[in-house]
Amino acid sequence: TFLTSHSAHIANTMEFAKVRYAQKSNAGVIYKNLNTFARANPENVDFIRKYLTLTKCDLFFADKAIFVEGASERLLLPDMIEKCETAGVFGSCKYPLSAQYYALIEIGGAYAHKFIPFIDFLGVPCLILTDLDSVADRVGESGKVVKKSVVVSQGETTSNETIKWWVRRNNGLPECDTSKIDLTEITSMTTANKTRGKCHIAFQTAERGLCGHSLEEAIRNVNRTHYDLGDSISEEDLEFKGKSKTDFALDLICECSGYCVPDYIKSGLKWLNDQRVLE
């Protein structure tokens, strides 16, 4: 029996070995056997299948994909895309990102890298928006040295597994490599370093002399008036406290409609917008 479907529920509950992925191209239609991917990536296939099933993800039917850290990004991204389009960030194009079919997938930096081989296999342009997550060695309560979250200017490395995976791949190192990655190597990455095939990674960058290590801190940095922050502040003043991340995002949308979008998000969205798919 051969069944074609546009149902994310059906596609995600099927065994990978039984799924054939059809994709339009300028040369016609390309068919991909997901069993080929499953055999080549046994370490990740169970995680991907379970995630797609549990979240009812529409990745199979999207022209592009955006992986985000959490609730704040998931709520804010559609509005940020509209803002970028209105501000002319995407330039002049027939179908800007807001008019394209993109899958918005909420998955943290600890797991996003597990999807990258699958994205490469499908050939779908993908933007990974993740957090810098700067950390440094500090003596913990037990007297042992542990990794503690610190402001970017004091950071030694990152706790973000996806960023570490990315840097290791750029340096030709195996995934199992445990050597320390200096934060300066991460923060100095060029646009070319942040792009691998049809995948692009974006994280917080310095703006107005400071750099946050999360979305919330980056937003507070470029919207200082709204958060009663002056020009003479430190990275410690950017720290997000109190409200839940969902409340933070909703408050921003409802109470500060003219907010500024952080540069790393604008540049990442522009990269994704510029990736051409069959029209």
Predicted regions and their residues:
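Switch/communication elements of ASCE P-loop NTPase nucleotide-binding domains
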Residues: 1-55, 258-266, 270-279
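Acidic, Mg2+-coordinating catalytic modules of nucleic-acid enzymes
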Residues: 52-67, 71-279
